[in-house]
A protein has these predicted regions:
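Feature captures hydrophobic
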Residues: 1-116
Length: 116
């Protein structure tokens, strides 16, 4: 089951990539580093150019680093787990600018809608 979540976490980031644009970059202005504990690290750059999503470590210091497992990422993406609850129960950790972290919900919503 873990491998399935790893594959699906890649699809979540593919969806996020599909909604990146210069408009989103102008609105958000942040680099996010996702450390998926049982998978890869992902960088969501919503600060530079048209925006980008890649695997690995960020080239610049991220405004926000989020650590969670792939199962909780999928649950959050599908709205089965609320970010505040995940944070309060230790299912995810956030380091950096909390206000920038909160803007991710808009990005996740746009990515969910793009997949419909």
């Amino acid at each position: 089951m873990g491998r399935l979540y790893q594959l699906i976490s890649g699809q979540v980031f593919d969806r996020i990539k599909s909604v990146t644009s210069s408009h989103v970059v102008a609105e958000v202005g942040a680099v996010y580093h996702f450390k998926i504990t049982n998978d890869k690290c992902y960088v969501v750059d919503l600060k530079n150019g048209e925006g980008s999503v890649s695997t690995g470590e960020p080239l610049e210091k991220p405004e926000v680093t989020i650590t969670m497992n792939s199962e909780n990422l999928l649950k959050m993406f599908n709205r089965e787990l609320q970010p505040a609850n995940a944070f309060m129960t230790g299912k995810l950790t956030v380091k950096g600018d909390l206000s920038k972290a909160l803007t991710l919900e808009k990005i996740m919503k746009a990515a969910r809608e793009a997949g419909k």
